[in-house]
Every structure is written in C-alpha cells, then in structure tokens.
C-alpha cells in the first residue's frame, strides 16, 4: 500500500520520512553508535539547541 506509506499530512510533511528519521535517530542509544555527530548551535535569540545525527 503506497498510500499508507506516503501519507501527506496537512502540514506538508510525509508520514514515511518522519517515521524513518525517528526510528534511526531518536531510538538509537548514544552508548555505542556507529558514527554520530553532535552539533551545538546557538540562535540569535540565545536559545541553545543540540542536534545529534546518527549515520
């Protein structure tokens, strides 16, 4: 079923890509990842945001 996999919501984001990113990035434990990059970016407002990417 292609419709279930590529379900486009009203916001314009695809349901499939959101699930794939969540399972590969957030569910993986930072204990022993294959290769992960953690970038710390500070916006002009002063908010600190951490972004961890797993490969």
From Swiss-Prot:
Name of the protein: DNA-binding protein
What's the domain of life for this entry? Viruses
Which organism does this record belong to? Autographa californica nuclear polyhedrosis virus (AcMNPV)
State its location(s).
Answer: Virion; Host cytoplasm
Task: Enumerate the sequence repeat regions by residue range.
Answer: 5-10, 19-24
Oligomer and partners: Interacts with protein AC132.
Q: What does this protein do?
A: Plays a role in viral DNA packaging and nucleocapsid assembly. Promotes viral gene transcription during the late stage of infection while it is non-essential for the basal level of viral gene transcription.
Keyword Oxidoreductase on this protein? no
Task: Give a GO molecular function annotation for the protein.
Answer: DNA binding
Annotated stretches, region: 2 X 6 AA repeats of R-R-R-R-S-S: 5-24
Gene Ontology terms: cellular component: host cell cytoplasm; host cell nuclear matrix; viral nucleocapsid
Sorted keywords for this record are: DNA-binding, Host cytoplasm, Late protein, Phosphoprotein, Repeat, Transcription, Transcription regulation, Viral nucleoprotein, Virion
Q: Where is the composition biased (Basic residues)?
A: 18-41
PTM section of the record: Phosphorylated.
Q: Where is this region: Disordered?
A: 1-55
